[in-house]
């Protein structure tokens, strides 16, 4: 009986370690620093572009989003930005966004899950004092033909 319990214990330990080892090994965010840096850079640049605009040049931001977003992210963004396009000129709204921190939570060859923190500064009209805010986003990205695209965005 003791031998059987010991054997079961050893087997469970080996299985648990092999499962966690293979899960960690398949997450390139833990094992491939250059790939992690690449997706971090690409997604940071994307978010800086699509969440920054001036009331008189919203088309520049919309064009960037059309190029850099895919799938659900693009659909959601288009709905949100329709409101911006309508309201920003009347308020003379300018928004500057900058990614302040990024955590790549999961990374495979062509897919990534990231947690991103944005610092945002909005100026309305002739106000000299910007309003500042922070945002957290869960981002899903996909590599297509060697380029990273945001495919889903969700506030956290």
Each language-model region and where it sits:
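Short, low-complexity Ser/Thr-rich regulatory SLiMs
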Residues: 5, 106, 141-143
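Short linear capping/connector segments at secondary-structure termini
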Residues: 26, 60-64, 101
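Core segments of small alpha/beta cavity-forming domains
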Residues: 31-90, 94
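Surface-exposed, charged secondary-structure patches
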Residues: 91-124
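Short beta-strand edge/turn micro-motifs at domain boundaries
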Residues: 113, 134-156
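Solvent-exposed, non-transmembrane alpha-helical starts
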Residues: 125-131, 151
């Amino acid at each position: 009986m003791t031998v059987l319990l010991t054997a079961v214990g050893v087997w469970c330990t080996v299985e648990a370690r092999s499962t966690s080892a293979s899960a960690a090994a398949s997450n390139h965010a833990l094992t491939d620093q250059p790939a992690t840096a690449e997706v971090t850079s690409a997604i940071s640049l994307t978010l800086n572009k699509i969440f920054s605009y001036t009331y008189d040049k919203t088309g520049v931001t919309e064009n960037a989003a059309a190029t850099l977003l895919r799938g659900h992210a693009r659909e959601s963004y288009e709905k949100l930005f329709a409101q911006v396009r309508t309201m920003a000129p009347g308020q003379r709204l300018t928004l500057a966004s900058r990614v302040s921190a990024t955590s790549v939570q999961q990374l495979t060859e062509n897919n990534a899950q990231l947690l991103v923190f944005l610092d945002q500064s909005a100026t309305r009209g002739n106000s000299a004092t910007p309003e500042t805010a922070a945002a957290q986003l869960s981002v899903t990205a996909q590599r297509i033909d060697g380029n990273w695209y945001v495919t889903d965005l969700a506030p956290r």
